[in-house]
Amino acid sequence: LDEVLKIYSGGLGVLAGDYLKEASDSNADLCAIGFLYRYGYFTQTLSMDGQQIANYEAQNFGQLPIDRVLDEKGEQMVVDVPYLDYYVHAYVWRVNVGRISLYLLDTDNEMNSEFDRSITHQLYGGDWENRLKQEILLGIGGILTLKKLGIKKDIYHCNEGHAALINVQRICDYVAEGLTYDQAIELVRASSLYTVHTPVPAGHDYFDEGLFGKYMGGYPSRMGISWDDLMDLGRNNPGDKGERFCMSVFACNTSQEVNGVSWLHGKVSQEMFASIWKGYFPEESHVGYVTNGVHFPTWSATEWKHLYAAHFDENFLYDQSNPKIWEAIYNVSDEEIWKTRMVMKNKLIDYVRKQYRETWLKNQGDPSRIVSLLDKINPNALLIGFGRRFATYKRAHLLFTDLDRLAKIVNNPDYPVQFLFTGKAHPHDGAGQGLIKRIIEISRRPEFLGKIIFLENYDMQLARRLVSGVDIW
C-alpha cells in the first residue's frame, strides 16, 4: 500500500496492495484481512564489506493511517482464535484503502503470553512453529474476524498458501449449521479461489504432522472427518504417512479455481501441482493464470501523468486496459517522450548519488572511491534495474557468471551499460545474503566501479524511483 505501513516485504505484498487500490477504483464489493506487524520487515543497511545488517524498528501504531475497530461496547474489537487448548486474542484495526476496508490483526497485547504476542511482530519471523501460528491466525482468525464484523462474501480469495486455513474454518462453520462434511466442502470449493505466486516447490509451506497436530488436532471432529482425512487434504499422495502437510496442496484441494500469475507461470503451476490430481494430464487441471497487473496511479510518475493528460482521452484513467486508448501514444512526438524519459532518469541518478554520499558519510568510507564512483555514473548509458527479494531461486547472480564478458559490455565506449541492483535477503538466508555481498564485492572492482551499483533498503519508495527512472526493468 505505502512504505509507511511496513506490512510487506516484496512483490506479493505490493501486488496485494494494488489489488485493493484497483478494487476501490472499480467500486468492487471487497474487503481484506492481514496483519499489523509491530516491527514489519526489517530495514536494511550494509557494512563496509557488503554484509547485510537487519534492523527492526517498532512501528508506533498511533502515528499510522489506521483506525481501531470498536465493538458494540465502544471498546477495541478483540477476536479470540483457538490454539491447542487456549486462545490467542487479536486486536482488530482498519485501514481505509479508498472505498475498501483492510482489517489487520494484532496479537501484541497484554492478553497474550510473550510467545503469542510475537505472532504479529515480524513478517517472515521466527521458526516453523511461529510460522504455523501466523497462518492459523491469518486463516482461521481471518474468518472469525469477518464473522464478528458481520461480513459475509460470495467469494473467498486465498492469496498464496499462507491463508489456506480459511477453508478449515469455513467447513467448520457449515458443519455447525447442520451440513455434512461432503456438502460443506463442496460449498467451500465452489466459492474459493487460490492464487499461487511461487514457481518452485521450496516456496511452499510444509509442516510436520506432529507440529501441525499440536495446533490443529481439534479441528477434524468439528469438520466431521478424521485426522488422517485432514492430513490427506494437504498431501500430494493421500495415505502417505511420511508426507508433510502442505498449505498449497490444501488450498488446491479446497478451491474450485487455482491460478498462476502469468501465462508461463500458469503452465509451471500445472506441472508443479499435477501430482494432486492423479490420472489427469497437467493441462486438464483447473489451474489457470491471471497475469499480474499494477495500480497505474500508484506507479506512474507525475511527469508521465501530465503527458497522458495532454495527449490521451479524458477517460483514460477509467479504462487503462483498453488497447485502443494506448494507441494515442503514437501521436506523441519522439522528442517529448525522450525529454520526459531523461527527466525521470536524471532524477534517479541524482537520487543514487545522494544515497551514496550519505552511505559514505555513515560508513566513513574511502573518499576517493566514492568520488570516482560518482564521476563514472553516466546519464547517457543504458540503465538496467534489478529489484527483488534476494532469494537464491530468483537467480540474481546470473549476470555475473562471465565477468570478462560483463566488463566488456559495461565499458563499451559507444554503447555503455549500467546496472542498478537492490533487494533484501531474509535474515536467516545466508545464501541470499552471500549473493548481495558478492555483488557489492564485484561492484568495487575497478572495471565495474560506477557500472554495477547496489542500493540498500529496497522499499516501495525506492521501487517507484527505479521503475520510473531506469531504461530497462
Residue ranges of model-derived segments:
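Catalytic cores of carbohydrate-active enzymes across secretory and cytosolic contexts
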Residues: 1-473
